[in-house]
């Protein structure tokens, strides 16, 4: 949660936005509350505490109403509850979740100045009165019985930035009619990590590669570049299960690591991931990164891996999905397909040179802005006569759904190569 201070806005400023019926305090995610306090500015923590009574009143009225506002798939609700009964419901779990009458309840115990619920639902957790260290969130969700929602908690210390520290999760809530989980099993395919020296980036960059089983027989397989390539280790098991079941084509997954350090304490004073993934920032880093992928990584993969010369698939989730769309628009000589899952920022127009690029676009019902942007981009592509599949899932900005959707995306983008097609 949070964002960058736009042009003309004080980087120390705190602003508000409404999300799911709640007024939320936000600020530039690279600025800490300690920096704001040192400058005599209001902090995000102070504004959040000031907003809490009004937010509770609105959420209590919404709980009593029993429904959802028109056009909304999710809304915050609240009912005053006894701390002891909540603790009993939490039991020994640090993070707990359950459903009652279409309402998802979440409890977390931990120390923080502020706590943020992340994953498929992204909202501040509220402190429970009379129970220091106990935090709660309740949301009414349309189609909750069909939903899969990953839940995590980011704990933000006094004076910290909006990043915070991962404190709990992931806990996966699964509705009574939700898709079944794919059982964990050891990979039969190969998973390897490489470090590539890049002349265009002027620095080394990690690449994680998944090669499906049976790929060593001399044949060549389609290739898919995945943004945020550290996540290939999480995507590979679901993809391999689909390949073995015949519902996805055997595909080599090449994951190009993003530029951001994993440790929040070592993050630079710039969002390097966004600068590389989003052309809207007009940074030279975007062009350099795209050239690195198209002109260095893909030729490297062609010489080392059992992958066909092309065209390749560009895939990603969140800002990585925006990158995949931009890659298809700007380098149709390399990418013949795009798998964009939860892309929040899309181009303003369709590049004429990209008319033959196939697009698989998908978003969750619980990420309204991204859902709307995805639908608008799909409609724009369809108006130009381009091949486009548009899907939605009953969930949010959630890696469970991203991992589930990639095999379906590859099956659609590479028609006729899955055994079940």
Indicate residue ranges for each PLM-predicted region:
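Compositionally biased, low-complexity flexible segments
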Residues: 1-11
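N-terminal amphipathic/hydrophobic targeting modules at extreme N-termini
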Residues: 12-14, 24
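Non-catalytic cap/lid and distal C-terminal segments of serine-dependent acyl enzymes
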Residues: 27-122, 130-421
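Intrinsic low-complexity/disordered segments
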Residues: 14-17, 38
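Charged/polar low-complexity intrinsically disordered segments
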Residues: 9, 17-18
């Amino acid at each position: 949660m949070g964002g960058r201070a736009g042009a003309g806005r004080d980087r120390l400023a705190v602003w508000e936005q409404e999300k799911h019926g709640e007024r939320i305090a936000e600020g530039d995610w690279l600025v800490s509350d300690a920096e704001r306090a040192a400058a005599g500015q209001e902090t995000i923590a102070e504004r959040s505490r000031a907003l809490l009574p009004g937010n509770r009143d609105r959420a209590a009225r919404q709980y009593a109403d029993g429904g959802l506002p028109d056009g909304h798939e999710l809304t915050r609700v609240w009912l005053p509850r006894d701390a002891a009964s909540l603790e009993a419901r939490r039991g020994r779990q640090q993070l707990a979740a359950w459903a009652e009458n279409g309402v998802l309840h979440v409890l977390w115990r931990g120390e923080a100045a502020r706590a943020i619920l992340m994953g498929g639902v992204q909202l501040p957790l509220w402190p429970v009165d009379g129970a220091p260290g106990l935090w709660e969130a309740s949301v009414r969700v349309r189609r909750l019985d069909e939903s899969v929602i990953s839940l995590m908690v980011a704990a933000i210390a006094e004076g910290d930035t909006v990043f915070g520290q991962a404190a709990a999760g992931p806990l996966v809530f699964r509705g009574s009619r939700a898709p079944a989980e794919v059982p964990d099993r050891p990979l039969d395919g190969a998973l390897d990590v490489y470090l590539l020296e890049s002349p265009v980036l002027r620095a080394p960059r990690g690449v994680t590669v998944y090669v499906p089983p049976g790929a060593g027989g001399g044949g060549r397989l389609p290739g898919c570049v995945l943004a945020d390539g550290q996540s290939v280790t999480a995507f590979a098991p679901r993809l391999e299960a689909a390949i073995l079941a015949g519902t996805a084509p055997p595909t080599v997954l090449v994951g190009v690591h993003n530029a951001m350090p994993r440790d929040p304490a070592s993050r630079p004073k710039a969002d390097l991931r966004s600068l590389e993934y989003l052309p809207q920032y007009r940074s030279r880093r975007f062009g350099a990164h795209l050239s690195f992928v198209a002109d260095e990584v893909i030729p490297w993969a062609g010489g080392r891996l059992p992958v066909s010369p092309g065209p390749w698939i560009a895939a990603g989730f969140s800002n990585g999905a925006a990158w995949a769309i931009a890659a298809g628009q700007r380098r149709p000589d390399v990418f013949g397909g795009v798998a964009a899952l939860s892309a929040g920022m899309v181009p303003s127009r369709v590049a004429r040179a990209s008319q033959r690029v196939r697009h698989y676009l998908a978003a969750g019902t619980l990420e309204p802005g991204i859902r709307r942007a995805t639908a608008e981009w799909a409609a724009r592509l369809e108006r130009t006569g381009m091949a486009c599949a548009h899907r939605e899932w009953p969930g949010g900005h959630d890696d469970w759904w991203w991992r589930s959707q990639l095999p379906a995306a590859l099956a659609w983008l590479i028609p006729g190569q899955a055994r079940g097609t």
